[in-house]
């Protein structure tokens, strides 16, 4: 078999297995499956809202599914692993099945669509689109869309980011298709950008030596000014002090003058005696 035909056959088998599991696990809240081929066989991971209903009592239902997959689709040693879908309101397959079930139970399509859209957005989805098509209220078919948030419709982001689910509601007037597309929270979109604050520079510790050197000239100037002020104050104090004058007698002579004259006369007398 050519390589191209082999890939086509594998894709066709995968689609048939997905359709079979969706039909068998409708009541368990089927949320999709992932099939991988390994050297030990075919590994199938089933996501469901109620994993206990997939396994069954004592593993009875999961063994039945394993036998049917091996016999009907000729899978090599199929091994089924059941996982919980997590937040069911963010799984497009689960939301589409709920919407189809609501329409089958008689809900008005606008009420059902708006209710599901609000639940999905309240769960934290970045965007959601619900498309309901078929005979909604009259004999003619029409399409109604309910949109909220951000949705990619084309390109690689639409294939990798957007989760798509489809379900059919069967009513008396005919079949109604329900398509749900959800952008989960945390999805990285190609046109997203983020502004980050610049990194903070580490605070530098002040250098003590420079501060000391800068402080020395100012201290020297203050010392000189203080010394000059002290000298000036001493000079002013000396100038302001009054000059003391000796007391005078009635004749206008100081009391020491007579003593000095007496000493002079005694010296003259002594000199005359020596001359003789």
Swiss-Prot record:
SUPFAM superfamilies the record matches: Prokaryotic type KH domain (KH-domain type II) (SSF54814), Ribosomal protein S3 C-terminal domain (SSF54821)
Function per UniProt: Binds the lower part of the 30S subunit head.
Domain of life: Archaea
Oligomer status and interactors: Part of the 30S ribosomal subunit.
PANTHER family (alphabetical): 30S/40S RIBOSOMAL PROTEIN S3, SMALL RIBOSOMAL SUBUNIT PROTEIN US3
Annotated family: Belongs to the universal ribosomal protein uS3 family.
One of the record's GO molecular function terms: structural constituent of ribosome
Biased composition (Basic and acidic residues): 228-240, 258-276
Organism: Methanothrix thermoacetophila (strain DSM 6194 / JCM 14653 / NBRC 101360 / PT) (Methanosaeta thermophila)
Region (Disordered): 193-276
Protein name: Small ribosomal subunit protein uS3
Record-linked Pfam families: KH_2, Ribosomal_S3_C
Coiled-coil parts of chain: none
Annotated TM spans: none
Domain KH type-2 span(s) in chain numbering: 17-86
Biased composition (Low complexity): 214-227
Keyword annotations from UniProtKB, A to Z: Ribonucleoprotein, Ribosomal protein, RNA-binding, rRNA-binding
Lineage of the organism: Archaea, Methanobacteriati, Methanobacteriota, Stenosarchaea group, Methanomicrobia
GO biological process, one term: translation
Listed GO CC annotations: cytosolic small ribosomal subunit
């Amino acid at each position: 078999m050519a390589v191209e035909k082999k890939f086509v056959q594998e894709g066709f088998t995968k689609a048939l297995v997905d359709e079979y599991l969706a039909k068998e696990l409708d009541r368990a809240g089927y949320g999709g499956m992932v099939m991988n081929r390994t050297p030990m066989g075919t590994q199938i991971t089933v996501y469901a809202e109620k994993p206990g209903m997939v396994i069954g009592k004592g593993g009875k239902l999961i063994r039945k599914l394993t036998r049917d997959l091996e016999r009907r689709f000729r899978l090599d040693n199929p091994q089924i692993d059941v996982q919980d879908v997590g937040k069911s309101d963010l799984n497009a397959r689960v939301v589409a099945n709920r919407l189809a079930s609501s329409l089958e139970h008689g809900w008005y399509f606008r009420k059902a669509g708006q209710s599901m859209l609000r639940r999905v957005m309240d769960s934290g989805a970045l965007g959601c689109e619900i498309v309901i098509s078929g005979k909604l209220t009259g004999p003619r078919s029409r399409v109604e869309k309910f949109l909220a948030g951000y949705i990619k419709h084309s390109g690689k982001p639409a294939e990798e980011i957007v989760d798509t689910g489809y379900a059919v509601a069967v009513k008396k007037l005919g079949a109604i298709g329900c398509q749900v597309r959800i952008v989960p929270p945390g999805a990285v979109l190609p046109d997203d950008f983020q502004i980050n604050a610049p990194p903070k520079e580490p605070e530098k510790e002040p250098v003590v030596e420079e501060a000391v050197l800068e402080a020395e000239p100012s201290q020297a100037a203050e010392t000189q000014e203080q010394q000059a002020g002290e000298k000036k104050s001493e000079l002013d104090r000396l100038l302001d002090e009054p000059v003391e004058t000796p007391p005078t007698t009635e004749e206008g002579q100081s009391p020491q003058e007579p003593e000095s004259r007496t000493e002079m006369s005694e010296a003259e007398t002594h000199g005359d005696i020596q001359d003789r």
